[in-house]
Amino acid sequence: MKTDTAIEAGCHRIAHAIGSASLARYHGDVTRAFAEGSASCWSGYYHGILEHALIGAQTKAQYAAVARRVCSGASIRATVWLAYQCVHGLGHGLMLQSGYNMPFALSICDRLKTDWDRSSCTGGIFMENINAANGSAYGQKTQWLKKSDLVYPCDWVKSRYKLYCYLMVTSRILGANGYDWKATARICAGVEKGWVATCFQSYGRDADGSTRQNASKVLSLCALTGTHEGDCLYGASRDMTSNYSSGKQASGLCAQAPAGLRARCFYGIGTILGNFDSSSSAHEAACRELTRTYYAACLRGTGD
């Protein structure tokens, strides 16, 4: 993949297609299909499985029944990491199978069993909405974007939906403004009260993804955010840890960050590491392997 930039750039959507085909191969067995995949390319494989799982649902009741069932398997719920990939992928599938009917898709997320599931599901919806704007939505279009307001729909949706919308909003902004990072930072600084930090975390996630996890480039982009550099590095370290399913690469980023921001950066790594395994001993071992100086910050991030 590293030798073909076109494939590398589109690997998330390619992985979606592979995941969808895998579910067909295993005759709709979501648990088995999940067991055969990995988190490469920002977990596109997992997301694709859920896109395919909703094929055949027509009524709201049918969508809701499938949505509550597909991510309930014990092996999927074994870790927060896998459960999140499943429920997030469900959000993608709801958008695609409903023809980008965002209010409908959100209403199905609302019918999941827990607050965590409901919130995580919305992330897939907002990511898929942005995919439509950035030309990776299988030819479908969305009406839930505005050229005159690049933050929309985050500044329009109900408060319970805002978190994951703002965690992805800069993908929309950057795609629309030609990756003008300084302009994007200005937009984040001006979003509605209470969501500025989240917008800059999104900026950090995009800094990591757009540079293909190049630590020096991420640091340069985060430096453009001024007083929000810590939020940027937090978002970048989380994204890097998620993409590699490991904190090793992200720890290199954090080690090069400004000294006063390193603890926050390692804390970000910990928030993702904590999802890979539920045991405190595993959290301690993972953080100890990465850093001595910022071990406590990493461990706090895991929830221990």
Regions found by a protein language model. Give the residues of each.
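Non-catalytic all-alpha helical scaffold/repeat segments
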Residues: 1-304
